[in-house]
Amino acid sequence: MSVMDAIVVKKPQAARPSSGAEKPSLIGLSREEMAAALREKGVPEKQIKMRVSQLWNWIYVRGVSDFDHMTNVAKDMREMLKQHFTIARPEIVEEQVSNDGTRKWLLRFPARGAGRPVEIEAVYIPEEGRGTLCISSQVGCTLTCSFCHTGTQRLVRNLTAEEILSQLLLARDRLGDFPDREAPQGTIMPAEGRKVSNIVMMGMGEPLYNFDAVKQALLIATDGDGLSLSKRRVTLSTSGVVPEIFRTGEEIGVMLAISLHAVRDDLRDILVPINKKYPLKELIDACKAYPGLSNARRITFEYVMLKDVNDSLEDAKGLIKLLKGVPAKINLIPFNPWPGTNYQCSDWEQIEKFADFINSAGYASPIRTPRGRDILAACGQLKSESERMRKTERLAFEAMMIANHGADD
């Protein structure tokens, strides 16, 4: 299938009620919060634990999005739940399928408070032996990474734990990854096991600027009695919010990735301006102190290859020196051009020389194969269609290194 053959599937859905009529969702609540919500609606105390267990199983194991499908819950209880709560998925505005099997969903969440509805994109990348979902944590981004398509776009708001988890639930719906579900005909996905085996917090926004919601969502995603993803298959990527890095390992316990991209402070100040606040020494010191760090649980360092900017042999030498003493994997990302950028991708021969040098020093240094370019789903290219039309409000998100993250076992 050629680039022009990429499929676009429009998914119009009924409008959600206005914010004033919006029911609270049970998705994204901790067990304690779910118990409190049921208690407030008059569920007898002696039933609370059992009802929470039922709901948890139906929402996260069976994947239902309608209370009427909860067949072991009494009808009067289902009616109460329907009256006061929701477990609905976000609206799918558009679904695109790349010729390499990559899927991109444009999702719309309802207005909250005095705000307006917001849109984000989630991306699924099937690979041999795994399927990786890239999830967003914010609408927009406060970071101004100069090589990224989203670098000048403002933050609208944080996503809630519900909205973060809903991206995973919706993807599993669409891919037939819940019990008794079938995948769309012709879907490219792993031959065995889960369709969504890995998730990466690398979509729109900086996850560590929305720490509490991200923490709650990931703890639910890795809960052994629910979605049950292995923490070794969940990767959180940060541009370097140093104060929250230790907390990420201590309180969430997932794999860590760092958007590095430069080995000198003067250059990283330009490419990743958060470096002005948290320079390289502080960042690397925080990485060395990451809880659970070992050769079996290495930190991944992302490094976008920019021609004549950061791709010299001296840069490769500096990278090895910088990461000395850090159990690390270095992912080299060929730059994905976007309209108006002044950067170019490094020549392939130079990328291979860079990778060989890093590898000879003992670091795994895979070169990431670009995916989903025909639907603008590749690294740094993601941007919702509705926001392309609203040029003065350009909202988008960074999708750093979606594939090749987390453990395979």
Swiss-Prot record:
Q: Where in the cell is it found?
A: Cytoplasm
Which PROSITE patterns does the record match to this protein? RADICAL_SAM
Q: Which of this chain's residues are annotated to bind S-adenosyl-L-methionine?
A: 205-206, 237, 259-261, 336
Q: How is the cofactor bound?
A: Binds 1 [4Fe-4S] cluster. The cluster is coordinated with 3 cysteines and an exchangeable S-adenosyl-L-methionine.
- Per the UniProt entry, the disulfide pairs are 134-379
Read off the Gene3D superfamilies from this record. 1.10.150.530, Aldolase class I
Report the family membership. Belongs to the radical SAM superfamily. RlmN family.
**Extra facts:** Reaction proceeds by a ping-pong mechanism involving intermediate methylation of a conserved cysteine residue.
Full protein name = Dual-specificity RNA methyltransferase RlmN
Q: Which gene encodes it?
A: rlmN
